[in-house]
C-alpha cells in the first residue's frame, strides 16, 4: 500500500503481493474474484501518528481508526456497496511529560480482521480506510486479500 493524492493505493505485483487462478486487481475497483465460492477475506492496516501538543482534554486527542472491507459488482449488481467486515481501534496518544518535543511521541497500532464470506464470480472486494494519512505503508504493515476455501 502507498499514499496517493486521493487516498490509499494498493500494490498487486510487487513485494509479497500476488494474484492466482484468474483473480484480477484494479486499484480503483478492488479485487475481482474469479468464481463463486466461500472465501476467507482478511485485512490488516498499520497506522502511525504523533500525539498533539500538550494541553486540552485527553479525549480530544483520541482518534478512532476504521478499516472496512466492502463488496460490489458482479452478481451483487450495481448500486450501493455492501459492508462485509469492519475493524476499529481508538487511540489516545500519551503526551510526553518531559515536553522534550513540540509534539508528543510517535504512536503505532494496527487494525486487523478477517472472516468467511460467500462471494460470486465477478464480485469485487475493496478496503475503505478512515484516516489514509495515518496509514503505515511500509513493507508488510498494510495488506488485504481473499483465499477461496470452499
Curated annotation (Swiss-Prot):
It is a single-pass type II membrane protein. Cytokine that binds to LTBR/TNFRSF3. May play a specific role in immune response regulation. Provides the membrane anchor for the attachment of the heterotrimeric complex to the cell surface. Belongs to the tumor necrosis factor family. GO terms for cellular component: extracellular space; membrane. Transmembrane segments: none annotated. The gene is LTB. Heterotrimer of either two LTB and one LTA subunits or (less prevalent) two LTA and one LTB subunits. Keywords: Cytokine, Glycoprotein, Membrane. Glycans are attached at residue 128. It is found in: Membrane. This is Lymphotoxin-beta. Pfam families: TNF. InterPro entries: TNF, TNF_C, TNF_CS, TNF_dom, Tumour_necrosis_fac-like_dom. SMART domains: TNF. Residues 1-149 form the THD domain. GO terms for molecular function: cytokine activity; tumor necrosis factor receptor binding. One of its GO terms (biological process) is positive regulation of canonical NF-kappaB signal transduction.
Amino acid at each position: 500500500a502507498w499514499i496517493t493524492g486521493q487516498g490509499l493505493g494498493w500494490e498487486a505485483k510487487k513485494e509479497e503481493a500476488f494474484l492466482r487462478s484468474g483473480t484480477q486487481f484494479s486499484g480503483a475497483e478492488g479485487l475481482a474474484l474469479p468464481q463463486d465460492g466461500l472465501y476467507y477475506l482478511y485485512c490488516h492496516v498499520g497506522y502511525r501518528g504523533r500525539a498533539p501538543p500538550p494541553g486540552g482534554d485527553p479525549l480530544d486527542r483520541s482518534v478512532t481508526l476504521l478499516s472496512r472491507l466492502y463488496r460490489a459488482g458482479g452478481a451483487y449488481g450495481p448500486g450501493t456497496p455492501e459492508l462485509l467486515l469492519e475493524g476499529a481501534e481508538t487511540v489516545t496518544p500519551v503526551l510526553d511529560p518531559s515536553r522534550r518535543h513540540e509534539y508528543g511521541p510517535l504512536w503505532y497500532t494496527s487494525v486487523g480482521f478477517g472472516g468467511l464470506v460467500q462471494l460470486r464470480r465477478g464480485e469485487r472486494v475493496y478496503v475503505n480506510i478512515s484516516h489514509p494519512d495515518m496509514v503505515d505503508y511500509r513493507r508488510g504493515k498494510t495488506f488485504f486479500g481473499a483465499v477461496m476455501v470452499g
